[in-house]
Regions:
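Sec-dependent N-terminal signal peptides
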Residues: 4-13
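Residues on the lipid-exposed face of transmembrane beta-strands in outer-membrane beta-barrel proteins
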Residues: 28-32, 58-64, 124-131, 142-148, ...
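Positively charged n-region of N-terminal signal peptides that target proteins for export
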Residues: 1-4, 20
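Extracellular/periplasm-exposed beta-strand and loop segments of Gram-negative cell-envelope proteins
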Residues: 35-53, 80-121, 147-178, 206-242
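Substrate-binding/catalytic groove segments of enzymes
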Residues: 192-198, 207-212
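Short glycine/proline- and aromatic-enriched beta-strand/turn motifs that initiate or cap beta-hairpins
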Residues: 19-65, 71, 235-252
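Sec/Tat signal peptide C-region and signal peptidase I cleavage site
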Residues: 13-19
Length: 252
């Protein structure tokens, strides 16, 4: 988040070097995000299922008007969505059983699952069209740019103390960089001469490549043997709609 914010500020400062700086306005908004499509699916037979649950979105943007209706906008987006642990765990157990490694009901206490949330940062830019209704502004925008996804670090481990081995299913990648596209709309309501209330809805789409491996690690006294049992990858579409509320500040 800090790197995206720093890059966003750098771009804003670079553009303002040859623009009329007093025309800029900035906004800060936050709210909820609702995953869509296969990103929200929990189908263990679909490689593109994202197991994403409702999450949180934060937006920071800067706009430079070039006419009464058109402007150029840069946006930094931060989003996070928790993962449905129950269905993801079912998927990983099914994959383990196919090795095959099966866990008896009496041994399930030795089976553990760790997973964190989906999270991504995006740096976007594009045109914005504005309509003015007696001091109330309606913005329509289409933005594109870079998306950096921090992948859920899912790990299923079966480790029974009486065995001289343990099984591990884990991600082999932590981040993925791809293209992101956003289409959104927002209303700006006057509060003071320089401050507006902003209420917006945005659709966002990108994708992330997740890679994993399945291994069995055997203790052979002073050494350990790591046996690769399987591996694979999946391109998961990231798709969500967010509703946010925040404030706009005008330099002039």
């Amino acid at each position: 988040m800090k790197k995206i914010a720093a890059l966003f500020i750098l771009i804003a400062l670079s553009v303002s070097a040859y623009s009329q700086s007093d025309n800029w306005f900035f906004s800060f908004s936050m709210g909820g995000s609702l995953p869509l499509g296969t990103f929200v699916k929990t189908d263990i037979d679909n490689k593109e299922s994202g197991y994403a649950k409702n999450g949180f979105t934060l937006l920071l943007d800067a706009t430079y008007p070039v006419s009464n209706h058109w402007g150029l906008k840069g946006m930094a987006l931060v989003n996070t969505n928790p993962v449905d642990r129950n269905w993801l765990g079912t998927k990983l157990e099914t994959r383990m059983n196919a090795v095959p490694i099966s866990v008896a009901d009496a041994d399930r206490e030795f089976l553990s699952l760790k997973v964190n949330s989906w999270m991504w940062n995006a740096l976007l830019a594009g045109p914005v069209f504005t309509m003015n209704f007696d001091r109330v502004f309606w913005d329509l925008q289409v933005l594109g740019g870079m998306n950096v996804a921090y992948l859920p670090q899912q790990k299923l481990q079966y480790e029974k103390p009486s065995n001289n081995w343990y099984y591990l299913d884990r991600n082999t990648t932590t981040t993925n960089v791809s293209y992101g596209l956003s289409a959104g709309t927002a209303f700006r309501f006057p509060v003071t001469d320089r401050i507006n209330l902003r209420v917006g809805v945005d659709y966002y789409r990108s994708n992330a490549k997740v890679q994993y491996e399945q291994v069995r690690v055997t203790n052979q006294g002073a050494t350990t043997l790591t046996e690769k049992l399987g591996s694979g990858s999946a391109n998961i579409p990231i798709e969500m709609i967010s509703g946010t509320i925040g404030f706009v500040y005008y330099l002039n």
